[in-house]
């Protein structure tokens, strides 16, 4: 029912940990994970398009492998599509406006919502704010 696609340039242990997290947190039995090793030979859009064309399922999740999802997110995602058959896509972060170009940051201003806390291993941590400071975390279904 669900295909999860991600691009990686991380080590094997990191990817193993991420796959285990997806498997334990998704909350459904019918899913596939498509991992694409990518050392800058393809754009992220090319990887996602490749995964979508190779997917065996009608619901596809394009995800970064450095996030964590709450337990049961797959059930919630399926329910969202079941309750809203006119939905074609559900997103987590970025913008409340999607320009024709597909470049979400093209018109940042008031359309951007959210903040991203960066924590690269062995490097300085920082916060990117795409909107005013949020009073609390915003619960989401998927990315």
Residue ranges of each PLM-predicted region?
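Conserved donor NDP-sugar-binding/catalytic core segment of glycosyltransferases
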Residues: 41, 72-112
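The conserved acidic donor/metal-binding loop of glycosyltransferases
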Residues: 64-68
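A short beta-strand-loop structural module common to alpha/beta enzyme folds
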Residues: 30-42
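Glycine-rich, basic loop-to-helix element that forms the pyrophosphate-binding segment
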Residues: 39-55
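A recurrent flexible, glycine/aromatic-enriched loop bordering the glycosyltransferase active site
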Residues: 122-143
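Short aromatic/hydrophobic "clamp" motif used to bind/position activated sugar donors
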Residues: 60
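Short alpha-helix within the catalytic core of nucleotide-sugar-dependent glycosyltransferases
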Residues: 19, 49, 57, 71-82
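N-proximal low-complexity "stem/linker" segments adjacent to membrane-targeting elements
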Residues: 1-24, 32-35
């Amino acid at each position: 029912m669900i295909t999860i696609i991600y691009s990686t340039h991380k080590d094997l242990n990191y990817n193993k940990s991420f796959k285990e997290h997806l498997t334990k947190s998704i909350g459904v039995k019918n899913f596939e994970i498509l991992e694409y090793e990518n050392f800058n030979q393809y754009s992220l859009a090319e990887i996602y398009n490749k995964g979508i064309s190779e997917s065996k399922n009608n619901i596809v999740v394009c995800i970064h492998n450095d996030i964590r999802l709450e337990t049961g997110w797959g059930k919630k995602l399926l329910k969202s599509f079941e309750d809203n058959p006119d939905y074609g896509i559900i997103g987590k972060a970025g913008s409340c406006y999607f320009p024709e170009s597909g470049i979400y940051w093209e018109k940042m201003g008031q359309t951007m919502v959210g903040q991203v806390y960066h924590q690269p291993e062995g490097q300085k941590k920082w916060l990117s704010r795409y909107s005013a400071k949020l009073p609390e975390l915003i619960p989401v279904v998927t990315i």
